[in-house]
Regions:
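Short alpha-helical hairpin
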Residues: 1-2, 24, 75-80
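Alpha-helical scaffold segments that form or flank carboxylate-/histidine-based iron centers
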Residues: 7-15, 34-54, 91-95, 120-131
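Charged/polar positions within long, soluble alpha-helices
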Residues: 24, 28-31, 54-61, 65, ...
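Alpha-helical bundle segments that constitute or directly flank the non-heme di-iron/ferroxidase center
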Residues: 2-33, 92-116
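Conserved alpha-helical segments that form or flank metal/cofactor-binding pockets of metalloenzymes
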Residues: 37-73, 135-147
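Carboxylate-rich helix-loop segments that flank metal/cofactor sites and access channels
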Residues: 54, 58-96, 100-106
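Preference for long, well-ordered alpha-helical segments
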Residues: 101-147
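Membrane-interacting alpha-helical segments
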Residues: 1-9, 63, 81-92, 142-147
Length: 147
């Protein structure tokens, strides 16, 4: 396996881990969201993160790597705890926690999407980065609309 393939596998594995961590953070956040429209949208975002995990794990295997397990890493525990604490303050706190989670995810997708990769991997990364931007934009828009 070439060095750049190893680096790509590691980068995609880090994205998978971020998506795993985001799924757990959404679990905490949606518990405190009473607004049915926002809750439904957050659950949709969580499902998109699950889809990213499955798809990117398959790409990792196709590249000859082994995807990470579906448990949180240390950063994931911190993100989940932060989401839980913020969510206790209700909808606004939950959205603030998810904004931070999505900012981290967007930042890393933004870096990795520019890497050299096989066409099908590149397309998946572009699609998922686009979805991540939608998640963040939605959360920011709702926060800005709140008093």
């Amino acid at each position: 396996m070439k060095e750049n393939e190893k680096d790509l596998i590691k980068a995609i594995s880090n994205l998978v881990q971020l998506d795993i961590d985001a799924v757990h953070a959404y679990d905490q956040a949606v518990k405190e969201v009473d607004d049915p429209i926002i809750k439904e949208r957050l659950l949709k975002f969580q499902e998109e993160h699950r889809n990213h995990i499955s798809s990117l794990a398959e790409h990792i295997r196709n590249l000859g790597g082994q995807p990470p397990g579906k448990s949180k890493d240390f950063k994931g525990y911190v993100i989940e705890a932060f989401a839980a604490i913020r969510s206790f303050t209700g909808l606004k706190g939950a959205l603030k926690a998810m904004r931070i989670t999505e900012e981290i995810t967007n930042r890393y997708y933004g870096e990795v999407v520019s890497w050299e990769a096989p066409a099908e991997v590149k397309e998946a990364l572009r699609t998922y980065f686009s979805e991540e931007k939608i998640h963040l934009d939605y959360i920011i828009s709702n926060l800005q609309a709140m008093p």
